[in-house]
Amino acid sequence: RQLDEKNWTLFYTKTNERRIVYTWNPLTICEKQNDEIHVIREITTPRLFKQLRGSSHGVHIDDEIWFLCHLVNYEDRRHYYHIFVIISAETYELIKYTQLFTFEREMVEYSLGFAYVKKDGQFLIGYSTNDNTTKYLIIGKDIIDEMTITHQ
């Protein structure tokens, strides 16, 4: 497997072992040992996931790991759309994902990462618009939960 990949996404297991999301379709979970990448798990995901690119690291929320990803649609210019992907912290199986969304309806938006503030039930999301701004959004987890589609 290729060692230099800009769209890899990192997360840690419950036992603090580093893992890599290598691709989103299939959801390919890897580990790095001695400069070699080893596939641990491959999981079937919706066809839409073929277009996903990593944006954020995985964030643990209870028994789930949340990722903020994006895809690029080349309509007349490139348009960025975002999606939260939620997997099981135990099995890495896909649990749910959100509908596609934008932050400001700008063509070029890129997520810089996010954090979850459990006591407030809110996400703090950093993002850029048109490759020349840095902005933050605070949004309730309940709002994101309303946007989710349960994977079957």
Stretch-by-stretch model annotation:
Residues R1-Q152:
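Beta-propeller domains
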